[in-house]
Amino acid sequence: MEQLQPPSPYTYNRRQTRDSEEHAEALGEWDQVYDQLSPGAFEGSLVDIWFEGLQVFRETTNRSVSQSGTTWNGCYVVGIPVNMKGPGLFSKQVLTRDSMLTFHSDQEFSLTAPEGFDVVAVAVPEKTLMEAMQPGSSEELYQLFPKSPKVMVAAPGQLDELRNCLLSILDPASFEPELLAYPQVQKAISSAIIGHLAEVLTSATQAPLPTRSFKGRCHVVKEATNYALTHTTEPITVADLCEKLNISRRMLNYCFQDVLSTNPVHYLRSLRLNGVRRELRQPGNIPGSIRDIACKWGFWHLPRFASEYRALFGELPSETARNSRN
């Protein structure tokens, strides 16, 4: 009788989240910031599995969120939407359900996800991908699979096969994670994922590039956002942004509407409210510090601030602070 091999190490994490920042922190070995953009209580879920050097995960978010960050060193990431209520924006490129996002750990990514965003993804060591795709050199691999964040398209059948392969592993109703204790199971699943991934990437092409005018509007939005977030101690106004970027109020509004389907006042207020929320969630806050934090982020009318905060997050600032202390 063949002797069973000893159990192989793996990790399995399944979580339900009630806060965008909590959700960002839940994904192992990623350094991320999430900002909630659409109003209402946040609900998210995450299934995160590590085995055979791979990270496979599925995450869902019910609210539109802005995401940015980096992942663990030396890996490529491929993400495939499962469901989404409208298109997303990945590093100035439109993301749909029929496309996939890709990037290397050397590069920071940015994603504006719509409401009802459900995505499966795999992070693969570069060496593993090299062995599977067998390019002649790293340069050839980078031509097939650029390091910079890209939206790619592939044959629908191949993309569906990879998506379904990942879903079959990440669905708690159909997969028992304890099976990963068997090295044979790990090897079989890893081989299936890498095989589908190599097929998809070999035939994938970059999605149609946005027009120069759209890229220009994305640049305006990014510059406006960066300026506002680096001047949190100042009550930045739309007029300030127009002066800084040397554009008209009408053009600034048009850029935000076209890229993010919102206006600059609403978007920048949402980012500031998220900044307040992150500070309120820090342990050690004392009663009365809510006013200080709100003023720090430029909110001077406290009743209006509390109303806007509750409209975005579904709870009052005092509730956030109280929950963080508990």
Identify the role of each PLM range.
Residues L252, F256, R304-F305, Y309:
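Short hydrophobic/aromatic patch on the recognition helix
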Residues E52-L54, T61-L89:
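Glycine- and acidic-residue-biased ligand/ion/polar-headgroup-sensing regions
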Residues E22-E25, A41-R63:
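A short glycine-rich, His/Asp/Glu-containing loop-to-beta-strand
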Residues R217-V221, L268-L273:
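Generic hydrophobic, amphipathic alpha-helix propensity
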